């Protein structure tokens, strides 16, 4: 005798469904034509439901009631004489309530074949548009399309506020060929919390955050959040058009590196972060007033541990909750652009943390990482390394880079820890790593990924800047990919940074023995397109602030720091300075507290801040300081061998017709009168800038603004002049005829 169950569920499908072992649920639940083609059958699984009716969406009429097949919550029934599928609601009677929902199992697959191909191939640039949680309109019905990559999972369900976190309620459709799971859910609200519930190959169940979530809960919670439907209306067309035609390797770039959580805080005890509106009102005017060209944001992808500063993100697509939502971040970038300020984002693609709700063994297998810890584990940070050879992982990362550039209008990415990506033996002892196919230590898969990434991003987003934090001598980081380079636009000059800060920390009396630490960088300055960076890494972990590194009394510390900045701004290469360094913060950076803005009540700190502002204005006003940054013709030593006096003199050149600039840097407290220097052209010169001016807190020694040229050749120049070189100072001299281009000091 046929029972209620086997009248609608064949071959034990009902038992398999109840036990969570029926993975092809879309072939069973929802609306289907009967085997004889003469009727429609609707099946559903609704725990605790008492009664279920099928309602036509078109006319709102009740079509049929479903039979309760068993007490577990299986319902099924035929649709009378109807044989043509139609859109319907389920009217569900519970013990204490009645609700109506659109049955998600009546919808077919929504994934596009081209998207699936590109995702698997490793070249998808918009995977976030079909993976994760995306608002869709299907046959006039609005809802959220959930999709996740989990090829080895036995079952995947989406659970959340909308289904009481019931893993049996919304089991997803499996695409066997590519490992994707999807479901379209109407009746989901903006801001709903959700996760993916996965049954691993060994039968264990684990709830995971959505790898493509665009919003997440704050720690210690870790649910993903359905995004808002509202979109930001961009007003930065002028900037975007200008950016697209700007050759940044020839343009001034003075980048202000910012940790949004500690630049400034609010609250009675500084316990609250500034939100994006606060940052629009405070950070942007400050950066503009200081004449920086760009802001670089330390990572803002969602991260659970404050002490990671964002460098161990779990939600790579989700702007952190700390400062506001995605629209708030877009408004901040938009406001920066309207103020003519570019915004670069720190991007972490070298590794990811082991937080159990994250990517680690996502479907019960090493999906994003390598199985072998000799390739998959980062020894320094106890994190996991992406499997750059897997197409889907490449698409995940490529799409994420595109996501920040396309959806948030960021002007470039600074890729963190590139060195750890390039070498298989990075921070490993012999026997702790596996060689590549040719027996070498280069990570060929990571190299290929970086080349592909840079090539595609520069092609898709004209005028962006791709910046590498790379600390080794790996050749060709900024060479084009068609010349076998990695294709970055710029590379941090870690050698210059280490040498110059080492020099800075020495007593002036001993600097003569370390003169090469400031001159050696010019031996390799044109091998890459370098960026001179003094970043957050140099003012933490007991290293002290820049001011703290310098020996001597306060006057010497401040004077030396001003001279150092002058040398940095005169040296070929773009500039990056971490927040707080521009006003000589005394204590090393603490991410838990605001910068010490109260120091600006004191003249020495005001002087350094004013000096940086004037350096930036000179930098932007004089093309000789940027247009030939990466060509030897843009720089010439006048004297690089005066170690006994610790004085450095050089010329910066621009294109034909551009005024040259002479830099004189004295790194001892000695004053030099009647000091002869060569001049790059005939005619008198003036002091464009003098770091020893009283305006900056100096002793106000110098040349009264004017340097009189003499027809005496010197240092390979036809003209020369006798000047006064102030103590611990930087002088910037330029032709009198061009002094209107710069602020005269």
UniProtKB/Swiss-Prot annotation:
Broad class of enzyme this protein falls into: transferase
List the Pfam families: Alpha-amylase (PF00128), Alpha-amylase_C (PF02806), CBM_48 (PF02922), GlgB_N (PF22019)
Q: What is its EC number?
A: 2.4.1.18
ATP-binding as UniProt keyword: no
Catalytic residue positions: 416, 469
GO BP term, example? glycogen biosynthetic process
- Quickly give the catalysed reaction: Transfers a segment of a (1->4)-alpha-D-glucan chain to a primary hydroxy group in a similar glucan chain
Q: Which domain of life is it from?
A: Bacteria
Identify the metabolic or biological route this protein is part of.
Answer: Glycan biosynthesis; glycogen biosynthesis
Name the GO cellular-component terms. Answer: cytosol
User: Per UniProt, which keywords does this protein have?
Assistant: Carbohydrate metabolism, Glycogen biosynthesis, Glycogen metabolism, Glycosyltransferase, Transferase
Instruction: Give GO terms: molecular function aspect only.
Output: 1,4-alpha-glucan branching enzyme activity; cation binding; hydrolase activity, hydrolyzing O-glycosyl compounds
Family affiliation: Belongs to the glycosyl hydrolase 13 family. GlgB subfamily.
What's the subunit arrangement here?
Monomer.
Do you know which PANTHER family this protein is assigned to? 1,4-ALPHA-GLUCAN-BRANCHING ENZYME
What HAMAP family does UniProt report for this protein, alphabetically? GlgB (MF_00685)
Function noted in UniProt: Catalyzes the formation of the alpha-1,6-glucosidic linkages in glycogen by scission of a 1,4-alpha-linked oligosaccharide from growing alpha-1,4-glucan chains and the subsequent attachment of the oligosaccharide to the alpha-1,6 position.
Stated name of the protein: 1,4-alpha-glucan branching enzyme GlgB
Organism, scientific name: Shewanella sp. (strain W3-18-1)
